[in-house]
Amino acid sequence: MRGKSINLFLMDGEAGGRIKCTLANWTGIAYKIPRTELDRCKEREDLKQSGVYFLFGTSDTTGKGVVYIGQAGARKNGEGILNRLQEHKRNPEKDYWTEAIVFTTSNNSFGPTEISYLENRFCNLALKANRYEVKNGNDPTPGNITEEKECELEEFIDYAKVIMGTLGHKLFEPITKPVEVKTEVEEKQADDIGKLYLKRTIKTIGTVEAVGMQTAEGFVVLAGSHISPSDDDTISEDI
């Protein structure tokens, strides 16, 4: 993948405030807006347009990251994305979110068809990555688009993926990525690289087996592993 030039504008002069994000040779615009700073965005004309948005927070029960993905169309009264975010802020059923990420365009080119398609694709990509709990109750409809428009929107999605990660949310990236291989021998060799295996027999429990690997985000225990349900006093306190 070629390098990309991303411009991050700290609208409040600090990393924890509002951020406007643009990319060279791209008509899209992204905003990262803390929930507490929504009222300071009332004068931004591009937030009165159509677009898609993501509400990020943390589950009180599981501690896992949660996200709600939605769309907002521009209205005749001049209200669009920001008005929809304000509605969510007032909704007690959506009090879990702490910040929003918004995607729109510099030329106000999104219509109902475009935002419906983007909402559907973003939702399915997030579900596939399984990194966040997706709070959408229903699967958004993709709408009917031409193949030319689909190609155009898929390019927009590719840029949006890069920006989403840059703004701190790897929503579309699975924790462990599949390894591309060509033969069965290469597949086994590639599959074993970097993995650590544990197999141990505990008298009161039986055999426990686990497989893990080091990733760029830390050590990950892979699916299918088994662990002891209770602490083992033979393990050093340092561990």
Each model region followed by its residue ranges:
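Short, surface-exposed loop and linker segments with low hydrophobicity and enrichment for Pro/Ser/Thr
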Residues: C41-K48, K89-W97, V211-E217
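Conserved short loop/helix modules at catalytic or binding sites
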Residues: G73-L125, S228, I235
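Sparse, context-dependent recognition of short Cys/His-centered cofactor- or disulfide-binding micro-motifs
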Residues: L38-R40, E87, T204-G206
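Low-complexity, flexible helical/coil segments
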Residues: T104-F110, K135-P142
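GIY-YIG nuclease catalytic motif and its immediate N-terminal context
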Residues: M1-N83, T113-Y117, R121, D158-G194
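Ordered hydrophobic segments in well-structured contexts
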Residues: V52-F54, V66-I69, I101-F103, E209-V211, ...
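Intrinsically disordered, charged low-complexity linkers and terminal tails
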Residues: M1-L10, D60-K64, A129-V134, P140-I239
